[in-house]
Amino acid sequence: MRISFFLLILAVIIGYAYGYSCPKPCYGNMCCSTSPGNKYYLTDFCGSTSACGPVPSCSGALYFTADSQRFGCGKHLNLCRGSKCVKAQIYDAGPAMWVEQDAGMMIIDASPTICHVLTGGSSCGWSDKFEITATVTSLTDSRPLGPFNVTEEEKAQLFIDHEIAMAQCEAEKTCNGFDLE
């Protein structure tokens, strides 16, 4: 009886730990949903194809991300870890939903430069569990692509701007996989 109870408790704990499921799958193998609280794990990539046009070079200090299925091609994201942030442009789709399921959390795939700026490391994998926030920039944001620092008040404003930008792209059906409906 005790062993059965122990196994049941263990199964419940494992289910919660690895229970991530995408609320809105799209394109066969990706997730179009955005993360509650805008929290994601950071991974890095450097691809040979792009869902949004030209493939960015992987050499040099470039600030790009995937996740076009969530936010839209060409949009800008503010990626923050603590008070360190990077403004980046969306160039590609991804990651695959199975990667997020293995990680147990939604992921922002970003350039190796972004990984280095936000973590100090040379690579970011989902198992590193580098948690960041990702917010869509406002249409009036004139900040150039690249790193910047924020205060708590400025970070709060990034979240407000994100909600406004997401409401606009949802109304225009240019994000969250609306083109699939």
Swiss-Prot record:
Listed GO CC annotations: cytoplasmic vesicle; cytoplasmic vesicle lumen; vesicle lumen
Cellular localization per UniProt: Cytoplasmic vesicle lumen
PTM note: Contains six disulfide bonds.
Listed EC numbers: 3.2.1.17
Catalysis: reaction(s): Hydrolysis of (1->4)-beta-linkages between N-acetylmuramic acid and N-acetyl-D-glucosamine residues in a peptidoglycan and between N-acetyl-D-glucosamine residues in chitodextrins
Primary location group: cytoplasm
Gene Ontology BP term (one): peptidoglycan catabolic process
Similarity field: Belongs to the dictyostelium lysozyme family.
Purpose of the protein: Has antibacterial activity.
Name recorded for this polypeptide: Lysozyme B
